[in-house]
């Protein structure tokens, strides 16, 4: 029978803790970027064309803010997937402890 267990209990627990922290942090960053927080302006990839465009410069900056926010939400979803995988590994390790050899 093929075992789906590929990491030990410590690594699985570490992956679970790190993924929970990553989801919380990236979700908060995504919220702050989509609400156009001024303190995060240094993390927005602005160019000179964005600041001096003929259209409306604030709209191009807001578009970049939203794009970075969406990227944070996508990364948070990836962390949810890794957390689910780590949770499954923790459960498989617990089940392995109770099996009689």
From Swiss-Prot:
GO terms for cellular component: membrane. Its EC number is 3.1.-.-. It is a multi-pass membrane protein. It is found in: Membrane. InterPro entries: Ribonucl_Kappa, RNase_K. One of its GO terms (molecular function) is RNA endonuclease activity. It holds the Pfam family V-ATPase_su_f. Keywords: Endonuclease, Hydrolase, Membrane, Nuclease, Transmembrane, Transmembrane helix. The chain crosses the membrane at residues 13-33, 68-88. Endoribonuclease which preferentially cleaves ApU and ApG phosphodiester bonds. Belongs to the RNase K family. This is Ribonuclease kappa-A. It comes from Danio rerio (Zebrafish). The lineage of its organism: Eukaryota, Metazoa, Chordata, Craniata, Vertebrata.
